[in-house]
């Protein structure tokens, strides 16, 4: 039974007759290999979420053990550089503000170092707010409106739309229903829960000259 290989802090792996070299990026602050990672498998290791970048760990990059003092020869099929299975995605703690590690990973979602997402890698870091894929709630800036909750993986238009905002105050134009006591002979002030119509409306029960006896 093959033993599990470990990456050393220097990025080199060793076990028996095979030796694997772990890819270390140019930035010294990012280390793609750790002592609890197996070198015989492909790992996708994220960098800090501050720059929203995932780096592909090119370990294993398999070399045959040198014979008779000859330099090692690189095998043709021992190099990975595009994607890896979600089984081997190993997240680090996200250091960026407003991000937390995701609980699960989507297969084939690991990105190479050259890919720079605008917001974040959705399979690795989630924002603290429940909005995914850079979605933001509608910003209803006009008075008397408030935004509806924005669901996950759904984007709202930037402008105010009828299904995106609910009126929270009185509309400043047009009268609402006016309640007038039917048996009153004097006009009453219109009442509509605080909203005043734009045009004064008087009651329909105003007395006429004939109703007053023409006196």
Curated annotation (Swiss-Prot):
The molecular function terms in GO held by this entry are:
structural molecule activity
Top-level taxon of the source organism: Eukaryota
Answer yes or no on keyword Repeat: yes
Establish whether keyword Calcium is in the entry. no
CC per GO annotation: cytosol; keratin filament
Spell out the Pfam families in the cross-references. PMG (PF05287)
Residues in the signal sequence: none
Q: Which UniProt keywords apply?
A: Keratin, Repeat
Assembly notes = Interacts with hair keratins.
| Function field | In the hair cortex, hair keratin intermediate filaments are embedded in an interfilamentous matrix, consisting of hair keratin-associated proteins (KRTAP), which are essential for the formation of a rigid and resistant hair shaft through their extensive disulfide bond cross-linking with abundant cysteine residues of hair keratins. The matrix proteins include the high-sulfur and high-glycine-tyrosine keratins.
The record's family statement is: Belongs to the PMG family.
| The protein's name in its UniProt record | Keratin-associated protein 26-1
Natural source organism: Mus musculus (Mouse)
Gene of origin? Krtap26-1
């Amino acid at each position: 039974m093959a033993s599990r290989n470990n990456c050393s802090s220097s990025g080199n792996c060793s076990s028996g007759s095979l030796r694997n070299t772990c890819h270390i990026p140019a930035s010294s602050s990012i280390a793609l290999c750790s002592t609890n990672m197996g070198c015989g498998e492909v790992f996708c290791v994220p960098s800090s979420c501050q720059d929203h970048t995932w780096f592909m760990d090119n370990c294993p990059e398999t070399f045959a053990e040198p014979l008779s003092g000859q330099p090692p020869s690189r095998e043709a099929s021992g190099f990975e550089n595009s994607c890896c299975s979600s089984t081997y995605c190993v997240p680090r703690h996200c250091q960026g503000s407003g991000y937390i590690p995701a609980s699960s990973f989507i297969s084939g979602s690991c990105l190479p170092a050259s890919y720079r997402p605008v917001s974040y890698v959705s399979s690795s870091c989630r924002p603290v707010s429940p909005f995914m894929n850079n979605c933001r709630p509608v910003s209803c800036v006009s008075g008397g409106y408030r935004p509806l909750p924005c669901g996950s993986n759904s984007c709202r238009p930037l402008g105010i739309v009828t299904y995106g905002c609910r009126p929270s105050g009185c509309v400043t134009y047009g009268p609402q229903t006016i309640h007038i006591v039917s048996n009153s002979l004097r006009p009453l002030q219109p009442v509509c829960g605080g909203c005043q119509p734009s045009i004064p409306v008087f009651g329909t029960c105003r007395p006429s000259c004939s109703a007053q006896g023409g006196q």
